[in-house]
Structures are given as structure tokens and as C-alpha cells.
């Protein structure tokens, strides 16, 4: 039994880090909570308040008090002797200004350039939101997350893309409209988080089928499988693979290509070999272009 367990663990480790791994898969097997945002402030500047968010209102100076209010079902909070302030759909900065203006109606020391009472509004407990991760996800389904969560948070909760899922064109759908597309390679290779938007109640994160997949072996820094977008070619692939190791021959790449069914002939191999000469990291003049096909 122990031997079977060790064998299964070795196979799992190989699937995440060995030559048979898909680039990016190990990212979703980090410790739990790596991408789980806190359930209380601070929040990004573009965070918009909603029903259930908790506000902490602090005033000091000529008047001192502290209030805690939860945004109610009407999307507002009620201030003593000052009335209602609408919060839902506004940023924290906008809400702070509205609260300061409302309090100034009953506390003269808050208003004007010579105000002797300062007001600060911060966020306490954040509301939960329900989002959906569908398509080719490892664990598709509905997830309750903090309202400070982003697309990456939802992906991590769902275990990331499945073996058949794309790492390159993950879509954030709000209503019936795609509002952002996340390329995980841009994040993993260059640290770029374009498309990693804050989530809202009812958002859907959709993982489509993967694009072309190419297997890199030999003396590169990260030999494994890579998913390639339209327009990407051999230099892009070598860049994703971390470049060549010192012992590599820098001016030649061998490609083993599996032929499409329409190109196969009876009695002939189902694959061909191509030698691509490189110059300055690109196919040399007169060499095959190095177009990469799925498989």
C-alpha cells in the first residue's frame, strides 16, 4: 500500500514539475490561502462598496466619536442626527466625502477650510460575494469569496484550469458581456496582471478549451508543455521555457511534428522531423519558419 501511495505521489509530482507537466499547473498547488484576500480592509482604490460591507467612522478634534455601520439592504448607512448616506456602488473615497459632508450638517467643526474636527472612514468586515467558475476548470462550480477577490482568487479556489483548459484566454463575464481576459502566462513570466479585475456578485469566470500545446524537451530551463496563442512562434516558446541552458547548441532546434490525419499516408510514419537553424534566437534565413502546431 505504501509503495502504491509513493508511486501515485511521484506521478502527481511529475505531472506538476517534470517534463510531462503543463507550464502553470504547479501554480495552483501552492499552500491554501495564497490568493485568499483578507475579509477586512484595506481594499484597492477601485473597490466599490455593497450591501453587507462594514464601515468604521472615526472623528477626532473638537468632536470625538467612533461609529460602526453596515451597509443595509438599501445600499446606505444611517448616521445619528445626520441622516442617510448612499454607499452601494461608490468607492471608499467617495463614501468618505459623502459622510463628511453629511456629518458637517450637524457638526459645524467638520466643515470648511478651518475645520477643527477630522473625519476618517475605513472598511471593517467585507461582504461575501458569490461567483461562478465554469468551463474547463479543475473544480467548476459556485464559490463564496471575499468581495476584495479577483479573477486569480476564483481560479485558485477552483484549482485552476483542468488538463483540457486554457491558461491563456480566461474570461471574466459580467451579465452577458466579457469585460476582461486574463493571460496567466503574462503573469507567470512577466508579472503582468492585466485582466485580473475585482469580482462582483454574480460574476462568471469562464475557462475555454486550451489552444495549441507544444512539448519542449532537452537543455532548456523549463522543459514541459506550453500553450501557445495565435501569432506566437518558436522564439516565444523558447522565452516561456526560460531560454537555453549553457550546454545547449544555440543555433539549432529539432522539431518532431505529429502529422494531421489528412497528411498521413498508408505505411508511412505519423510524424516528421524538422531542423530549424537559429540566428539571434530566430529562424535563420532559408530555414523553415518554425511554425508551431498543436501536438
Where are these regions (language model features)?
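Ser/Thr/Pro/Gly-biased, low-complexity, turn-/loop-rich segments
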Residues: 1-295
